[in-house]
Amino acid sequence: MDGSNDERLTQSVESFCLQNGDDGKLVLVDKMSQDILYSYDLKTRKKEVISCEGGSIDPQYVCFDGDWVFIADDCTISKTNYKTGECVYIWEVPEGKNVNITDVYIHGDKVYFGLYGTDSEAKDDTGLWCVNPDGTDSKKISSDEVNEVCFVGEEYFVR
């Protein structure tokens, strides 16, 4: 924490997040690597590949919930159990919709994500959305443009 022990974990980090709790795990998305998704143990300094086979194919956004890493690319959201390698699709952009996912965040019993409409027909879809972790009941929460989302208590903040 004093900056005296800097260490390069990877060449290129697209996204990262720290696991809640005492496990001290960091998840890294490394676009320059063949494996892309890693878990890094801050205590042992051990880096391990997390399998995301069968899930989002181009991870850009990640967040933790227990043993699950929630992963999003431009058009899909999936979750991977970093201990077992189990991977499950949660949600994907409906066919024919010109929108991109802009972030993903798990809070309580919902997965929150930003959508950005890339053409005039999809502009109404721009905003903060949520979905159940099993992929059901997706709904729009706000029309705010979302680059990042986080929660403090029960209040959300977007940038």
Each model region followed by its residue ranges:
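Short loop/turn segments that connect beta-strands within beta-propeller blades
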Residues: M1-S4, D41-R45, N81-G85, N132-T136
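Structural motif
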Residues: S33-S39, D74-K79, D119-W129
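Disulfide-stabilized cysteine-rich extracellular repeat microdomains
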Residues: S4, E14, C52-G55, E95, ...
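Eukaryotic tandem repeat interaction scaffolds
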Residues: D35, L42, S51-Y82, C87-Y105, ...
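A short beta-strand motif characteristic of beta-propeller blades
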Residues: N5-T10, K46-C52, E86-P94, D137-S142
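Repeated scaffold domains used in trafficking and secretory/extracellular systems
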Residues: V13-D23, G55-G66, K97-H107, E145-E155
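Hydrophilic extracytoplasmic domains
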Residues: T118-R159
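Residue position within the beta-strands of beta-propeller blades
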Residues: L26-D30, F70-I71, Y112-L115, F157-R159
